[in-house]
Amino acid sequence: MSDLYPFENNFLELNGLNYHYLDEGQGDPVVMVHGNPSWSFYYRNLAKALRDDFRVIVPDHIGCGLSEKPGDEDYSFSFKQRVDDLDALLEHLEVRERITLVVHDWGGMIGMAYASRYPERIARLVILNTAAFHLPPGKKFPLALKICRDTAIGTFLVHKLNMFALMAARVGCKRNPMSEALRGAYCAPYDTVSDRLATLRFVQDIPLKPGDRGYDLISEVEDGLDRFADLPMTICWGMKDFVFDKHFLKEWQRRFPNAEVHAFADCGHYILEDASDEVIPIIEQFLAANPLDAPLEKSAAASPDENA
């Protein structure tokens, strides 16, 4: 694993639990927030590419990656708690500069909820197949997720058989399917029943209607997104993602019409794996074109890549 993940491991004791994070390089902070059933491994290539010029901070959510895997008696596994954890980590690391926020999957909800608490701390946004709002118009909640979220058989498949992580690793890349070694690395933190409770709780915590835990918080985040309309933003999107599909991309574009958009027609959910050789240079160029010492201006709008 060390050849694929060549980083120093750091831990913060948070409410009695070990919270793992990467803290690489120096310079303007870039904070990368992963989703489910992923972990900081997803950002490894981007972290390596940026750490010579930036301070790269990448946490593993509690219950994920190399962080501790508690039971329900020791952790709430709630959306709000995830935001509180990220808040505590950045406070612990004394991050006082404005940050670049990179988000994927659940990381969009968590990261943008943090941003909503401290809008003045956010300098640039990198959006990767994610959301920070309720289901967009025209999008139905996928049946496979509904089964995992709401049924006993779904609980069995996700928790007992690890099918959520296993299938995500198999279908998350379309252009460049993951090798066996990569699939193994993505699933390694969740190799026992006790280690994969977070993958189940994340799915069960998806708020779909008023009264669901976290629904009001997502509503607050959604309602405050216009505060970030003038920030530099780049969006890299795998169009073959069956969850975060064209409807979600269209909603990002509606809310942020000045964002750069790079759509990849042949790529899936794990866009940093599927099109790493294109997406990482795009992000590097975006950061170079929008330095933090320059006045904040709207990003030039761009159409999806012609070759996507």
Name each model-derived stretch.
Residues 2-18:
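N-terminal cap/lid segment of alpha/beta-hydrolase-fold proteins
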Residues 14-15, 22, 58-103, 281:
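Active-site loop/oxyanion-hole signature of alpha/beta-hydrolase fold enzymes
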Residues 22-69:
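Conserved HGGG/HGGXW glycine-rich cap/lid loop of the alpha/beta-hydrolase fold
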Residues 33-35, 104, 237:
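The conserved beta1-alpha1 loop
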Residues 97-139:
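Conserved hydrolase catalytic core segment
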Residues 137-201:
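Helix-rich cap/lid subdomain of alpha/beta-hydrolase
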Residues 195-254:
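Conserved serine/cysteine hydrolase catalytic core
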Residues 259-308:
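Catalytic active-site module of serine/aspartate enzymes centered on a nucleophile-bearing elbow/loop
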